[in-house]
């Protein structure tokens, strides 16, 4: 008979305690379902924080990984291999704006590369260090490394890591007047923005906001950097979220769904900056390894397909309708916001701060969700989510919601 000491959870004390994972050990997955080591099934509407865009155990990704694993895993960037070269070409072609690509291992690394590229470009223009400011937006999230967490305009992620790097300025999201004022001094080299803030509460850019940011960047000869790490790769119904605003960026950062669950990141550079970094200006040991690139090529091809785009639009409407029906019954939400399959259900004031409690009850009923702060339930399921999976997820959410509202 197994005991608690036999569970992998007994080893959790070896982890640096920077996470608060649920006391569940997930063992396998298929589509939008996962099973724990006790055999219990869960419907997964979190997709590893918007990473598993094709669900779990996608056969095409497994085949690509298995085939490449039998050939070559790693060379470092002192040699060429075919998968990253082909991936770079395919990303440039798919992007509609980029000329060059830098491949790395994560979203944070992609954003670090973007920050360095901005600074290098400003330097190449003869701008002194005090005129290389990067503007970001309150509520943003750009990563955990020191420069990217400084770009992340949320004090809770920065506390205790001072002194932070200089040269960043924060303004309120969707506030054009505030951005105009922040750029008026002529010291801004770039504006870095998420088309939809993820960790900031699933908050979309207001209609026309990205176009105004682009215009201000043009006016002040500043770069536009779009962080599409969470909202990109088909999640909003188009391969890139900014396509829906018809703006052309100078730099785009990607990760998460690009690898379908295998770690990879990418920075895409447009013509204005594509030649800025030359030999030795930046680098990575593992970035663009043939194993990750082989998987990402297949993920990109599938995520860019019309079938995925159509499914995202259809399931987004169905998920919204399901959440609205729940709200009509239980009065839990003040607002449903977001685009595509990146939706946030904002809790009504009387339920403020209870997102975590609702997630606990959802897990009890076999549903895996995320929160985006204490007041928002975040839905970022696989983009190939089926009708049956969504219906099952909504049914489980209804059970969790009913139990929540019945509590004294």
UniProtKB/Swiss-Prot annotation:
Subcellular location: Cytoplasm
Transmembrane segments: none
GO molecular function, one term: N2-acetyl-L-ornithine:2-oxoglutarate 5-aminotransferase activity
Entry keyword set: Amino-acid biosynthesis, Aminotransferase, Arginine biosynthesis, Cytoplasm, Pyridoxal phosphate, Transferase
Entry's Gene Ontology cellular component terms: cytoplasm
Protein's UniProt name: Acetylornithine aminotransferase
Lineage: Bacteria, Pseudomonadati, Pseudomonadota, Gammaproteobacteria, Lysobacterales
Pfam family, one: Aminotran_3
Co-factor binding comment: Binds 1 pyridoxal phosphate per subunit.
Binding locations of pyridoxal 5'-phosphate: 107-108, 141, 227-230, 285
Catalytic activity: N(2)-acetyl-L-ornithine + 2-oxoglutarate = N-acetyl-L-glutamate 5-semialdehyde + L-glutamate
KW DNA damage (keyword) present: no
EC number per UniProt: 2.6.1.11
Further comment found in the protein's record: May also have succinyldiaminopimelate aminotransferase activity, thus carrying out the corresponding step in lysine biosynthesis.
One BP annotation, GO: L-arginine biosynthetic process
Subunit structure: Homodimer.
Residues reported to bind N(2)-acetyl-L-ornithine: 144, 284
Pathway: Amino-acid biosynthesis; L-arginine biosynthesis; N(2)-acetyl-L-ornithine from L-glutamate: step 4/4
Main EC class the enzyme belongs to: transferase
Organism superkingdom: Bacteria
InterPro entries noted in UniProt: AcOrn/SuccOrn_fam, Aminotrans_3, Aminotrans_3_PPA_site, Class-III_PLP-dep_AT, PyrdxlP-dep_Trfase, PyrdxlP-dep_Trfase_major, PyrdxlP-dep_Trfase_small
CDD domains membership: OAT_like
Family label: Belongs to the class-III pyridoxal-phosphate-dependent aminotransferase family. ArgD subfamily.
Cofactors: pyridoxal 5'-phosphate
Main location per the UniProt record: cytoplasm
Residues with N6-(pyridoxal phosphate)lysine modification: 256
Xref: Gene3D superfamilies: Aspartate Aminotransferase, domain 1 (3.90.1150.10), Type I PLP-dependent aspartate aminotransferase-like (Major domain) (3.40.640.10)
């Amino acid at each position: 008979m197994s005991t608690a000491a036999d569970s992998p959870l007994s080893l959790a004390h070896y982890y640096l305690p920077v996470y608060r994972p649920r006391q569940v050990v997930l063992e396998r997955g298929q589509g939008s379902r996962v099973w724990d080591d006790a055999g219990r099934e869960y419907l997964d509407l979190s997709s590893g924080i918007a990473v598993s865009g094709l669900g779990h155990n996608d056969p095409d990704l497994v085949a690509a990984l298995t085939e490449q694993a039998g050939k070559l895993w790693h060379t470092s960037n002192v040699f060429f291999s075919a998968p990253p070269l082909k991936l770079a070409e395919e990303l440039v072609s798919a992007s509609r704006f980029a000329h060059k690509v830098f491949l790395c291992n994560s979203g944070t690394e992609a954003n670090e590369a973007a920050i360095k590229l901005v600074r290098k470009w400003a330097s190449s223009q003869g701008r002194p260090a005090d005129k290389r400011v990067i503007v970001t937006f309150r509520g943003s999230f750009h990563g955990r490394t020191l420069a990217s967490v400084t770009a992340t305009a949320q004090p809770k992620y920065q506390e205790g890591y001072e002194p932070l790097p200089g040269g960043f300025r924060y303004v309120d999201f969707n506030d054009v007047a505030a951005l105009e004022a922040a750029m008026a001094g002529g010291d801004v080299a770039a504006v870095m923005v998420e088309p939809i803030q993820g960790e900031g509460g699933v908050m979309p850019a207001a209609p026309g906001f990205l176009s105004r940011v682009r215009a201000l960047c043009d006016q002040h000869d500043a770069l536009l950097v779009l962080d599409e790490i969470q909202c990109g790769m088909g999640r909003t119904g188009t391969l890139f979220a900014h396509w829906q605003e018809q703006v052309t960026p100078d730099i785009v950062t990607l990760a998460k769904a690009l690898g379908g669950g295998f770690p990879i990141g990418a920075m895409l550079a447009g013509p204005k900056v594509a030649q800025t970094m030359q030999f030795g200006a930046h680098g990575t040991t593992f970035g663009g390894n043939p194993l990750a690139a082989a998987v990402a090529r297949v993920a990109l091809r599938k995520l860019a397909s019309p079938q995925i785009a159509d499914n995202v639009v259809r399931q987004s409407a169905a998920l919204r309708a399901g959440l609205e029906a729940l709200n009509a019954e239980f009065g839990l939400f003040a607002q449903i916001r977001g685009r595509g399959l990146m939706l946030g259900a904002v809790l009504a004031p009387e339920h403020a701060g209870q997102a975590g409690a609702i997630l606990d009850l959802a897990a009890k009923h076999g549903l895996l969700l995320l929160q985006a702060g204490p007041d928002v339930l975040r839905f970022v399921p696989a983009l190939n989510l089926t009708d049956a999976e969504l219906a099952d997820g909504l049914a489980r959410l209804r059970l969790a919601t009913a139990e929540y509202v019945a509590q004294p």
